[in-house]
UniProtKB/Swiss-Prot annotation:
Cofactor binding comment, as recorded: Binds 1 pyruvoyl group covalently per subunit.
Organism for this UniProt entry: Dictyostelium discoideum (Social amoeba)
Assigned keywords, A-Z: Autocatalytic cleavage, Decarboxylase, Lyase, Polyamine biosynthesis, Pyruvate, S-adenosyl-L-methionine, Schiff base, Spermidine biosynthesis, Zymogen
PTM entry text: Is synthesized initially as an inactive proenzyme. Formation of the active enzyme involves a self-maturation process in which the active site pyruvoyl group is generated from an internal serine residue via an autocatalytic post-translational modification. Two non-identical subunits are generated from the proenzyme in this reaction, and the pyruvate is formed at the N-terminus of the alpha chain, which is derived from the carboxyl end of the proenzyme.
Protein name per Swiss-Prot or TrEMBL: S-adenosylmethionine decarboxylase proenzyme
Highest taxon of source: Eukaryota
InterPro entries, alphabetized: AdoMetDC-like (IPR048283), S-AdoMet_decarboxylase_euk (IPR001985), S-AdoMet_deCO2ase_core (IPR016067), S-AdoMet_deCO2ase_CS (IPR018166)
Gene Ontology process terms (BP): putrescine biosynthetic process; spermidine biosynthetic process; spermine biosynthetic process
Requisite cofactors: pyruvate
EC number: 4.1.1.50
UniProt-recorded Gene Ontology molecular function terms: adenosylmethionine decarboxylase activity
Function: S-adenosylmethionine decarboxylase is essential for the biosynthesis of spermine and spermidine. The alpha subunit contains the active site.
Entry annotation: catalytic residues: E30, E33, S96 (schiff-base intermediate with substrate), C110 (proton donor), S254 (proton acceptor), H267 (proton acceptor)
Length: 379
């Protein structure tokens, strides 16, 4: 398997040095998240760990909250709350979310967290469950203040170099590197990549939010997180969900939603000078036009990026047409499409509200991108 074992890989030996996480948010909180999606397969026949008498507690779901916290310590975030259903375990974190399936873990962290530093522990946890890594997907939108991040998250090229010391993957930049864009790294070790797979994920990353809307996400006496979830319209986005929500003090909001085997999550940074909202789900829809319209109606962003990952056989069909290019009240800035040999496609589109002029903040330096393998189709 093309991955360094946890016995020989550690950050110090590889020349990686932890820096102090000062949480310097004087110029605004860094809302855009780093996202790590790791899928596992059995090391051998019958190797996957299970808990007797608990049919749903298989593989990664046999790991308890305390053990997950030791993994998350490497990313410098903590578990706030936990919910579960028959399909997965959900954790709201101090900086975003963790979702755990029997053979998959999806972690999102914002701020100055060090998400990639937890990979070695994730690999070890998988081994303890009789699992090995089959696929790794790391992604993030461009950051507002990359210079305040902790290595390797100051630039995408540093992140790619870090990942390539562990995996043999490929890196892509989707969108205009001078404006809003999406960074993507994929390492695919699946033994049967041509088999039909049906996973799809949809993300909406929003900036320049309506200030009246954002006022709801400042903590107020006598107003609970659930009150905010209902009053804002979040509860109506995917009805029938189990929702775990949290209101931060003095401001900020996170929620995880479970809808049968699907997750969805929202994270909100409401301050006007750095406002940001993310919506992320793997709910299986034939198209995302209605859901996208509902999300935009709730938050009213000045600009947003929509990203769709879809495998062959996914309900959305051709991801290129899964959400409408012509979004009412918004002008599309660019659309980037990439098809992968493993049988999946990614579409990323950037939109700007028609009556708003956008001033972009400092982005990852272009020269830090040029050292990566950029492979895209601009349409």
């Amino acid at each position: 398997m093309p991955i360094l074992s946890t016995e020989i890989f550690n950050e110090a030996d590889a020349g990686f040095v932890y820096q102090s996480n000062s949480n310097d948010y004087s110029d605004g909180f860094e809302g855009p998240e780093k996202k790590l999606d790791i899928r596992f397969g059995p090391i051998s026949k019958g190797s996957v760990k299970s808990i007797a008498g608990s049919p749903s507690k298989v593989g990664l779901r046999t790991i308890d909250k305390e053990k997950w916290q030791t993994v998350l310590d490497s990313a410098r975030c903590t578990i706030i709350s936990q919910t579960s259903n028959d399909h997965m375990d959900s954790y709201v974190l101090s900086e975003s979310s963790l979702f755990v399936y029997p053979r998959r873990a999806m972690i999102k962290t914002c701020g100055t967290t060090t998400l990639l530093h937890l990979i070695a522990k994730m690999v070890q946890v998988g081994k303890e469950c009789g699992l090995e890594v089959e696929m790794v997907v790391f992604s993030r939108k461009n950051l507002n203040q990359p210079s305040k991040q902790v290595f390797p998250h100051c630039s995408f090229s540093d992140e790619v170099n870090f990942l390539n010391k562990i995996f043999d993957g490929q890196a892509y930049v989707m969108g205009d590197v001078n404006k809003d864009h999406w960074n993507l790294y994929i390492a695919d070790f699946r033994k049967n990549p041509t088999l039909q797979r049906t996973e799809q994920t949809f993300e909406v990353m929003m900036h320049d939010l309506d200030e009246t809307v954002m006022k709801q996400f400042f903590k107020r006496e006598g107003v609970s997180a659930w009150d905010t979830t209902v009053n804002s319209g979040i509860a109506d986005l995917l009805p029938g969900s189990m929702i775990d929500d949290f209101q931060f003090d003095p401001c900020g909001y996170s929620m995880n939603g479970l809808l049968n085997e699907f997750y969805w999550t929202i994270h909100i940074t409401p301050e006007s000078h750095c406002s940001y909202v993310s919506f992320d789900t793997n709910v299986a829809l034939a198209d995302y036009n209605q859901l996208l319209a509902k999300v935009l109606n709730v938050f009213k962003p000045g600009r947003f990026t929509a990203a769709l990952y879809a495998e062959d056989g996914a309900p959305c069909g051709d991801p290129y047409t899964a959400f409408d290019v012509n979004v009412p009240s918004y002008a599309i800035q660019n659309k980037t499409v990439h098809g992968f040999d493993g049988g999946y496609d990614v579409v990323v589109s950037n939109y700007q509200q028609l009556d708003k002029k956008v001033n972009f903040s400092n982005d990852d330096l272009i020269q830090s991108i040029e050292s990566t393998n950029i492979d895209l189709i601009q349409v």
